[in-house]
From Swiss-Prot:
Residue ranges of domain Calponin-homology (CH) in the record: 123-240, 268-371, 392-498, 513-621
Chain residue ranges for the region called Disordered: 627-664
Tissue specificity statement from the Swiss-Prot or TrEMBL entry: Constitutively expressed in roots, leaves, flowers and siliques, and to lower extent in stems.
Single GO MF descriptor: actin filament binding
Region called Actin-binding 2, residue ranges: 392-621
Subunit details: Interacts with F-actin.
Keyword field: Actin-binding, Calcium, Cytoplasm, Cytoskeleton, Metal-binding, Repeat
UniProt-listed InterPro entries: Actinin_actin-bd_CS (IPR001589), CH_dom (IPR001715), CH_dom_sf (IPR036872), EF-hand-dom_pair (IPR011992), Fimbrin/Plastin (IPR039959)
GO cellular component: cytoplasm; cytoskeleton
Start-end of Low complexity biased regions: 630-652
Protein name according to UniProt: Fimbrin-1
Top-level division of the source organism's lineage: Eukaryota
Residues annotated as domain EF-hand: 7-55, 59-94
Length: 687
């Protein structure tokens, strides 16, 4: 492990307000404005702060200059880095106040792809989160010795430090995500075991749709409150919104009005569907307003009163709507909900305060308990809206991968969300920096159809420059939502990204491109170095379905990560499934960011098999690169010996093995995308 410490701040409280990613970014900005004397003054700060994303949407440079002038100091006064951080926090707090406490970066759910620089998560939200944990994990065989937690104490932040609780909570949000056999669950874990749990947690959180771009394993090991609460809130949100789609709840089709299209409902994110459901019932109940958020529009509790009267008239209390005091009305609403068997998720005070996090969870809880939708023939066709299983799995994989990149947009449905081209341009900018001409791009909302086509045409143009196979593919195909073409394009993007990551670590290849054959040969050699005879001929090799090759590969790159007592022979379908589930969790525990499902291994989905193998290779080469760097910087014999002893697999020849394969050529993965896109293009031209 690296001995890197990061940016250190002498004030522990101040240090706790930022992640290392944030501190490094802010330190870089601070250093960039130093004058010739190596100093930073107050007058240097307004232009800098005005460019920071967390402040630029709220304040102009002149406003920031005025606020800094209120500090009462001479503008030529030197500002230390710690003073810079304190001033920044003060400005963030003013930004939150100006936007009514709901600054775009202050969401306690850590909305996808936003920065955590502004962590204004109300401490009161911790209580409901703790109650949620007590409710869903209270009977867990391992955690029941620590539960229930006291909502008024800091027990939560202590318990998360070993990583077990968060891993278990991920499985509550999306059952089966983590093979719990891979979680280290001894009562006392050593630092290495705790780090493995946190790594497994973060990679699994990404795999269910959480944004963790600013959270590291060390943040969880230290139990940093704002980051812990942010991650927990995302998991709770995913859990409570899981059924807000036509596939899980086909009755939702009842929400459609005559002018609405099913496609319109399909493209709505879950929270928007929940609002649509709420307004549907409010309209039936005679409520005159439209609820557009889970905060200000619910503060007076009137919408809640109307909603519950429609859903559960048998528990209606006339005093609720007659109440003049919002707090009193909120209390009566909660009593009504309890009579419906909705346990209290928030307090009357939190309704009146407008906590969007807790209100969303409460409305979702009401939906689950009693959605008030009819079960008749009207929604029967929604149940028949079945998609190809492999298409659904691929869409899920690409959606999660895109959301893990840290782009500004968030993808809810790949086939709908990429049609204006903007998200694809954001992805291209991530995987191939500076490839996008933003002057010729249109940002959503885009009203003019030709602007969408322009965006998509640029996507196709860049794809061809990157040597993607896009024969007879035009931007309009994306705008029209051609699923096969979109999947083919996304596969090439994902593969290109992985190969670029691998290429960046191969210093001995002299710029030669990485190929699929390189990855295949590396995997076979790695397994062979451990004395195993298992070898595969391609990423379509049917023997891969047993899972044994991948378990041996994982064991070869890090022997301690595989517990062979948990491995089956992989002969029956059940044994293959057990091995595949274990492989996915072990890979994530190791540090691989993978989005495939166990079924992809059992069925030998060659695309996902390639990405899994490449991810393991990337982790192995990355560790070798890091160890080589540490060894070079320390020039210590002791360190070198320790590094060698801790890595049984010979890592010295890691890059030599790979570079020796550079002459091997393959078109395995590209060919698959080529044939898929070419076939669809031909079909389109025939039609």
């Amino acid at each position: 492990m690296s001995g890197y410490v990061g940016v250190v701040v002498s004030d522990p409280w101040l240090q706790s307000q930022f992640t290392q990613v944030e501190l490094r970014t802010l330190n870089s900005k601070y250093v960039s404005v130093k004058n010739q004397n190596g100093k930073v003054t107050i007058e240097d700060l307004p232009p800098l702060f005005a460019k920071l994303k967390a402040l630029s949407a709220t304040f102009k440079e002149d406003e920031i200059k005025g606020m800094l002038g209120e500090l009462g100091s001479d503008t030529s006064t030197d500002v230390s880095f710690e003073e810079f951080l304190k001033i920044y926090l003060n400005l963030l707090s003013k930004a939150a106040e100006k936007s009514g406490g709901h600054h775009k970066n202050s969401s306690s759910f850590l909305k996808a792809c936003t920065t955590t620089l502004l962590h204004t998560i109300y401490q009161s939200e911790k209580g409901p989160f703790v109650q949620h944990i007590n409710r869903y994990l209270g009977d867990d065989p391992f955690l029941k010795q620590f539960l229930p937690l006291d909502p008024h104490s800091n027990q939560l932040y202590e318990l998360v430090k070993d990583g077990v609780l968060l891993c278990k909570l991920i499985n509550v949000a999306v059952p089966g995500t983590i093979d719990e056999r891979a979680i280290n669950t001894k009562r006392v874990l050593n630092p290495w075991e705790r780090n493995e749990n946190h790594t497994l947690c973060l990679n699994s959180a990404k795999a269910v749709g959480c944004s963790v771009v600013n959270i590291g394993t060390q943040d969880l090991a230290e139990g940093r409150p704002h980051l812990v609460l942010g991650l927990i809130s995302q998991l709770i949100k995913i859990q409570v919104l899981a059924d807000l789609n036509l596939k899980k709840t086909p009755q939702l089709v009842e929400l459609l009005e005559d002018s609405d299209d099913v496609e319109e409902l399909l493209r709505l994110p879950p929270e928007k569907v929940l609002l649509k459901w709420m307004n549907f019932h409010l309209k039936k109940g005679g409520y005159k307003k439209t609820v557009s958020n889970f905060s200000a529009d619910l503060k007076d509790a009137q919408a809640y009163a109307f909603l519950l009267n429609v859903l559960a008239p048998e528990h209606c209390d006339p005093a609720t709507l007659d109440a003049k005091d919002p707090l009193e009305r909120a209390e009566l609403v909660l009593s009504h909900a309890e009579r419906m068997n909705c346990k209290r998720y928030l307090t009357a005070e939190e309704i009146v305060e407008g906590s969007s996090t807790l209100n969303l969870a409460f409305v979702a809880q009401i939906f689950h308990e009693r959605n008030g939708l009819n079960k008749d023939g009207k929604y029967a066709f929604a149940e028949m809206m079945t998609e190809d299983v492999e298409t659904c799995r691929d869409e899920r994989c690409y959606r999660l991968w895109i959301n893990s990149l840290g782009i500004d947009s968030y993808v809810n449905n790949v086939f709908e969300d990429v049609r204006n081209g903007w998200i694809l341009l954001e992805v291209l900018d991530k995987v191939s920096p500076s490839s996008v001409n933003w002057k010729h791009a249109s940002k959503p909302p885009i009203k003019m159809p030709f602007r969408k086509v322009e965006n998509c045409n640029q996507v196709i143009k860049i794809g061809k420059q990157l040597k993607f196979s896009l024969v007879n593919v035009a931007g309009n195909d994306i705008v029209q939502g051609n699923k096969k073409l979109i999947l083919g394009l996304l596969w090439q993007l994902m593969r290109f990204h992985m190969l670029q990551l691998l290429k960046s670590l191969r210093s001995r290849t002299l710029g030669k491109e990485m190929t699929d054959a390189d990855i295949l040969s590396w995997a076979n050699r790695k397994v062979r170095t451990m004395g195993r005879k298992l070898q595969i001929e391609s990423f379509k090799d049917k023997s891969l379905s047993s899972g044994l090759f991948f378990l041996n590969l994982l064991w070869a790159v890090e022997p301690r990560v595989v517990n062979w007592n948990l491995v089956t022979k992989g002969e029956t379908d059940d044994e293959k499934r057990l091995n595949a589930t274990y492989i996915v969790s072990v890979a994530r525990k190791l540090g691989c960011s993978v989005f495939l499902l166990p079924e992809d291994i059992v069925e030998v989905n060659q695309k996902m098999i390639l990405i899994l193998t490449a991810s393991i290779m990337y982790w192995s080469l990355q560790r070798h690169s890091r160890e080589s760097s540490d060894s070079s910087s320390t020039q210590s014999t002791t360190t070198t010996c320790t590094s060698t002893a801790s890595s049984p697999a010979p890592s010295v020849t890691e890059e030599e093995e790979v570079s020796s394969l550079s002459g091997e050529v393959t078109s395995l993965a590209v060919g698959d995308a080529v044939s898929e896109i070419t076939t669809v293009s031909e079909e389109a031209s025939i039609e």
